[in-house]
Amino acid sequence: MKKKKQALKVLLSVGILSSSFAFAHTSSAAPNNVLSTEKYNKEIKSPEFISGKLSGPSSQKAQDVVFHYMNTNKDKYKLGNESAQNSFKVTEVVKDPVEQATVVRLQQVYNNIPVWGSTQLAHVAKDGTLKVVSGTVAPDLDKKEKLKGQKQVDSKKAIQAAEKDLGFKPTYEKSPSSELYVYQNASDTTYAYVVNLNFLSPEPGNYYYFVDAISGKVLDKYNTIDSVAGPKADVKQAAKPAAKPVTGTNTIGSGKGVLGDTKSLKTTLSSSTYYLQDNTRGATIYTYDAKNRTSLPGTLWADTDNTYNATRDAAAVDAHYYAGVTYDYYKNKFNRNSYDNAGRPLKSTVHYSSGYNNAFWNGSQMVYGDGDGTTFVPLSGGLDVIGHELTHALTERSSNLIYQYESGALNEAISDIFGTLVEYYDNRNPDWEIGEDIYTPGTSGDALRSMSNPAKYGDPDHYSKRYTGSSDNGGVHTNSGIINKAAYLLANGGTHYGVTVTGIGGDKLGKIYYRANTLYFTQSTTFSQARAGLVQAAADLYGSGSQEVISVGKSFDAVGVQ
């Protein structure tokens, strides 16, 4: 059973694994609510989070303030002889709605080629003072021998190498892509192609391959869609059915969900047919029927009387309703308009394949299997599952945490946290268990994971117990238990490993983690960097001397993350 549980907990899907150390500055006063901290990535001895009064006031553009700081601190960041202007590209500049600071998002480059996983965020206050730089910079690239050579492999050959390693011929959802990066692992730094293979059959996959641009060897790979034990997807694909939106009148229907509860549904009436298409929110919500095949998105769910009480309707009822709840949570709590904050439609497909024990975000929409009736019931019946998966989409459009090792475990934990908070928002039998409503219907009290007690299902609740192997993308669904426990303690309080945490409630938990995920976390955020970002987020929201700041720090003390 334990082995089975270990396999199944990777259901809810979409880095640098290292330890860190930090010390606080006392020499110069930081701006209001900015903590003076300097935290280094211990493995590569490069800063991963620095905050305080990092520069004086300035009338320059925010990005010029950042570049001036990086040039002044070239030795600290080990940039060699290159200027900051040649070492980084500005990818986004946004206003922080809380602090009214300007947030500059950077991508490290070398010879104008992006460095995989090396992104940074800098916060420049209204008076032009630089107050935060978050994100590890890959150091000493000018000293890496392989970066002095020429690539011998082209993009096409890199894709072929990835396809050969995959070992089977998939049916692609989109054409394979390949982009050249500077890539680092524990032993080497080289040019590599990052190849993306996205497909649904013979089983869903969204693989990232790293192919050495000099030797053509596969250096690493990971899949952001995880399969679980049970029947595989039906490989007999039908031609893609029409899935066009309809025009018509907004109406209200009703239906019974997977657990038998009745829900009100926002639908569209067009030509005497009702559709599960909700036009009333900032993002249109569509629910489709795969009809037990594997083509996406399927056909827009249609009904003759706007009453969805048939057994087959249940999965669609919950997918449609819970997508709306998740949208409302993020809109009402954070004024976020869909996962991309630009009104992107929310698409869900139910009845995917036959007896399929999985749910996943494929990069553009949600997909739900029906389960086999023993391990799972239809997976759209779990509100925390839907909140979890749509939060992966949000993370992809903000911090874009790499789905490996500590950054991947943080990615998973954020989805667990907000899946739970969405459940509390809707007040539909909320708890701190993940997947309890749809997992093992014949076993009461069972779940995929527990945030209150990760060890209940074999997950670590302290950094000293973390998984250090390479399975499950470096333990993304296992080590998430460490962050989950910290989040649970932050919301509810408690004593863990002799450390007492004062709880601040779920609402403040959500505000702090949302702010950190959107404005402080970078692609390769470690647990230690996450702690620093969350503490600073709490200081921004509640003040540097607040109980919230103290509790965030204590919650990480309790799980052994410094």
UniProtKB/Swiss-Prot annotation:
Binding-site residues, Ca(2+) 4: 439-440, 446
Subcellular compartments: Secreted
E.C. numbers: 3.4.24.28
Positions with a binding annotation for Ca(2+) 1: 303, 305
Lipoprotein keyword on record: no
Active-site residues (renumbered): 389, 477 (proton donor)
Binding site for Zn(2+): 388, 392, 412
Cofactor dependence: Ca(2+); Zn(2+)
One MF term in the entry's GO annotations: metalloendopeptidase activity
InterPro entries reported in the protein's UniProt record: FTP_domain (IPR011096), PepSY (IPR025711), Peptidase_M4 (IPR023612), Peptidase_M4/M1_CTD_sf (IPR027268), Peptidase_M4_C_domain (IPR001570), Peptidase_M4_domain (IPR013856), Zinc_Metalloprotease_M4 (IPR050728)
Alphabetized UniProt keyword annotations: Calcium, Hydrolase, Metal-binding, Metalloprotease, Protease, Secreted, Signal, Zinc, Zymogen
List of residues binding Ca(2+) 3: 423, 429, 431, 436
Reaction(s) catalysed by this chain's protein: Similar, but not identical, to that of thermolysin
Effect of pH on activity: Optimum pH is between 6.4 and 7.2.
Superkingdom of the source species: Bacteria
Residues the entry annotates as binding Ca(2+) 2: 384, 423, 431, 433, 436
Propeptide feature: residues: 25-245
Secretion signal, residue range per the UniProt entry: 1-24
Cofactor note: Binds 4 Ca(2+) ions per subunit. Binds 1 zinc ion per subunit.
One Pfam family this sequence matches: Peptidase_M4_C
Temperature characteristics of this protein: Optimum temperature is 58 degrees Celsius.
Enzyme class per UniProt: hydrolase
Function: Extracellular zinc metalloprotease.
Sequence similarity: Belongs to the peptidase M4 family.
Protein name per the record: Bacillolysin
Taxonomic source organism: Priestia megaterium (strain ATCC 14581 / DSM 32 / CCUG 1817 / JCM 2506 / NBRC 15308 / NCIMB 9376 / NCTC 10342 / NRRL B-14308 / VKM B-512 / Ford 19) (Bacillus megaterium)
Gene: nprM
